Curated annotation (Swiss-Prot):
Protein name stated in the entry: Fructose-like permease IIC component
Spans within the Cytoplasmic topological domain: 1-46, 123-126, 179-197, 259-276, 340-341, 400-415
Cell inner membrane is among the record's keywords: yes
TM stretches of this protein: 47-67, 102-122, 127-147, 158-178, 198-218, 238-258, 277-297, 319-339, 342-362, 379-399
Length: 415
């Protein structure tokens, strides 16, 4: 006799509801998991534009104010019209003016490039134009139309640009909107070109126009205006508090998510020309230099080797990577003994970065280490801040490890 298999009893709707909940949770986790990657895609494409613009602008300043010795209070155009320059010097000054103008244009394209590539990362190449348009409107917003009761006339006014905040919001929204429309709007094959070259671009452009004018520009402009007001009111103290916060967030996880978030904030202020990126750039290199230095001085200071054998060559590697702008060389030290490494390099990064900012070091160009050092204002002070932070890091980690070793809480295999 054949044995009939019993089928499992299925409760109608139960499995479907469970699957729906599971899919909803997966989509939420997928959204928040993928979003940082999309943002970093935009930042990585924006940085070369900023560097190109920054380097060319730096050429103009070096030629005009270092080579030709123009007084700092005089602009390049004023120097051209002064009649004091002729021949080769006049040609150099014309080139400086061209470099200044062209570099400024490149800087203006940084935020649109960021928004375009964030949208492209989310919604594909169909979302690229919408992101670019949104980024451009975040820096060059549409004039506001107002009715003046006193004159009974319509007039326009210039809103506060939403800049990086607006570009971030519109690029994400536009990217997902284009992605959704591309999936939902199904047309016959012979209308595919119409969909991709006309319908989706027009719909996304209209959406960007309305969203930027009525929502994002007012919101982002309000935030930017508030930030500028607070920083202006706080003056030097506000800049120093910002430097301390950015340095701490940059150093704490050595290239991890907190570091990336700090980079996002620093880039937004730098591209808006509100605050320079000095503190972040210094805080990137201090931890690996300081921990590498600790492996060199530990025996000289204490008479003992306080690191495991494999960390000594890694210390030299970390120092080399630091000069390339890579902080991840310090990760082995943080993993091996977080209680000694993390407080040490955080204190060093905060003190070194804040000291450099306080003493007048300024870096507007969004790169770190040797790639940006030639473009730093007050480079001597900047390097002194790095040295101070690295020395503090090295001394702290050496004496913390010595204290833990004496208490029997640290085992070392290189004695």
């Amino acid at each position: 006799m054949a044995i009939k298999k019993r089928s499992a009893t299925v409760v109608p709707g139960a499995s479907g509801a469970a699957a729906a909940v599971k899919n909803l949770q997966a989509s939420k986790s997928s959204f928040w998991g993928e979003l940082p990657q999309h943002v970093m895609s935009g930042i990585s494409r924006m940085v070369p534009t900023l560097i190109m613009g920054g380097v060319i602008l730096a050429f103009s300043q070096l030629i005009a104010y270092s080579w030709l010795k123009i007084p700092a209070e005089i602009g390049i155009m004023d120097a051209l019209n002064s009649g004091k320059f002729s021949g080769f010097d006049l040609s150099l000054l014309k080139f400086a003016w061209l470099s200044q103008s062209f570099g400024g244009v490149l800087f203006g394209f940084a935020i649109p490039m960021f928004a375009a590539f964030v949208a492209n990362s989310i919604g594909g190449k169909l979302a690229f134009p919408a992101g670019f348009i949104g980024g451009l409107m975040s820096t060059q917003p549409t004039q506001l139309l107002n009715f003046d009761p006193s004159t009974m006339q319509w007039a326009t006014s210039s809103p506060v640009p939403s800049t990086f905040i607006g570009a971030l919001i519109i690029s994400i929204v536009a990217g997902y909107l284009v992605k959704w429309m591309n999936q939902k709007i199904q047309l016959p094959d012979f209308l595919l070109a119409f969909k991709t070259t006309f319908l989706l671009p027009i719909l996304s452009a209209i959406f960007v126009m309305l969203a930027m004018y009525y929502v994002i520009t007012p919101f982002g402009g309000w935030i930017n205006g508030g930030i500028r007001t607070v920083l202006t009111a706080a003056g030097e103290k506000g800049a120093l508090m910002y430097a301390m916060g950015i340095a701490a967030a940059t150093a704490i996880d050595l290239g991890g998510p907190i570091n990336k978030a700090a980079g996002f904030v620093a880039f937004s202020f730098t591209t808006d020309h509100v605050l320079p990126v000095t503190a972040r750039s210094i805080a990137i290199v201090i931890p690996p230099i300081g921990l590498g230095l600790a492996t060199i001085i530990d025996r000289r200071l204490t008479g003992k080797r306080l690191f495991n054998a494999q960390l000594y060559p890694q210390g030299k590697t970390a120092m080399f990577l630091a000069f390339m702008g890579i902080s991840e060389g310090a990760i082995p030290f943080a993993l091996e003994s977080p209680i000694t490494a993390i407080p040490s390099y955080m204190v060093g990064a905060i003190v070194g970065s804040t000291a450099a900012v306080w003493l007048g070091a300024v870096q507007w160009f969004p790169e770190s280490a040797i790639w940006a050092w030639p473009l730093v204002t007050n480079l001597g002070v900047y390097m002194a801040g790095i040295a101070l932070g690295a020395i503090i890091t090295a001394l702290m980690v050496v004496f913390l490890r010595l204290m833990m070793f004496r208490k029997g809480k640290l085992l070392i295999d290189s004695l």
